[in-house]
């Protein structure tokens, strides 16, 4: 996130993979979840498990960007020492009126609002880019160990620090220029 653009919001359209800057409206401790105001007609649902292991880094970066403090990516990129506990409680991480960067994972239906995740991923043709991660993984459908190592080595040489990558099956036998262009 190097720029923050605010666009007029269409309250009737909310699609999977859309990214929103949302505000915590209510914490539901019994569900270990939060309801978020994204500017839509219905509040979004964010479960604790959907925060992702590196939520704290994402939160700090977003808050620094909003508050116009230093937003240099390299100041937050490599410190992944303290991932969120898998069995934690949402009220220990979020509170009312917190700002959260989220991505829609399930569209709203009937009376329910959209389901969202705080672990953002940006899908391309050959790669899926995951900010605030340092993990590179290769599709399990690529069985050739030599090709897996080649792809991992290529991606490590081109991926920016502070980003993780999932290498998709269609990346098999692709040249570095194709992968770099997709990135």
What are these model-predicted stretches?
Residues 1-183:
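Single-stranded RNA-binding surfaces
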């Amino acid at each position: 996130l190097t720029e923050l653009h605010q666009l007029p919001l269409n309250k009737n359209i909310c699609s999977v993979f859309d990214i929103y800057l949302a505000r915590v409206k209510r914490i539901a401790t019994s569900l270990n979840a939060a309801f978020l105001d994204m500017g839509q007609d219905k509040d979004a649902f964010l479960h604790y498990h959907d925060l992702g292991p590196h939520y704290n880094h994402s939160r700090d970066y977003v808050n620094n960007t909003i508050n116009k403090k230093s937003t240099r990516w390299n100041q937050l990129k490599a410190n992944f020492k303290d991932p969120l506990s898998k069995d934690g409680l949402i009220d220990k991480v979020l509170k009312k009126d917190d700002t959260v960067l989220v991505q829609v994972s399930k569209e709203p239906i009937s009376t329910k609002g959209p389901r969202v995740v705080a672990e953002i991923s940006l899908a391309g043709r050959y790669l899926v880019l995951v900010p605030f991660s340092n993990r590179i993984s290769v599709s399990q459908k690529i069985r050739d160990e030599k090709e897996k190592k080649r792809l991992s080595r290529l991606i490590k040489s081109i991926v920016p620090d502070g980003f993780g990558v999932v290498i998709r099956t269609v990346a098999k036998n692709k040249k570095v220029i194709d992968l770099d262009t997709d990135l």
